[in-house]
UniProtKB/Swiss-Prot annotation:
Forms part of the ribosomal stalk which helps the ribosome interact with GTP-bound translation factors. One or more lysine residues are methylated. Pfam families: Ribosomal_L11, Ribosomal_L11_N. One of its GO terms (biological process) is translation. Gene3D superfamilies: Ribosomal protein L11, C-terminal domain, Ribosomal protein L11/L12, N-terminal domain. InterPro entries: Ribosomal_uL11, Ribosomal_uL11_bac-typ, Ribosomal_uL11_C, Ribosomal_uL11_C_sf, Ribosomal_uL11_CS, Ribosomal_uL11_N, Ribosomal_uL11_N_sf. This is Large ribosomal subunit protein uL11. Belongs to the universal ribosomal protein uL11 family.
Amino acid sequence: MAKKIIGFIKLQIPAGKANPSPPVGPALGQRGLNIMEFCKAFNAQTQGMEPGLPVPVVITAFADKSFTFVMKSPPATVLIKKAAGIQKGSAKPHTDKVGKITRAQAEEIAKAKNADLTAADLDAAVRTIAGSARSMGITVEGL
């Protein structure tokens, strides 16, 4: 028989830097989950990733105080800013352009995000990433 699910917890945690301080501790503590067990498991799974890269995670909490978690790919905006070499997007995205990425860079981001995107094919995924980039004030060359 399947375990009874008592809730889902969605967090964004920097890769390799999960610790019991907020937001992780309070979110897991409310459900009575073992915070250190989660932190150790999360840090072990994100060991190969770039340190500090925000990783969305969905934690499923069960009635017996156990849990499972699923990691998603990093947010597209973070990957776009990294590819463009900027710290933040434009305050006026459609008038002030703050950076550029190429179609090849957009394709790399689309491939990394493919599991989390609802696009039918790679070209549609690239257009989705290009739209996100444009709304951040970044031009996409080759589109």
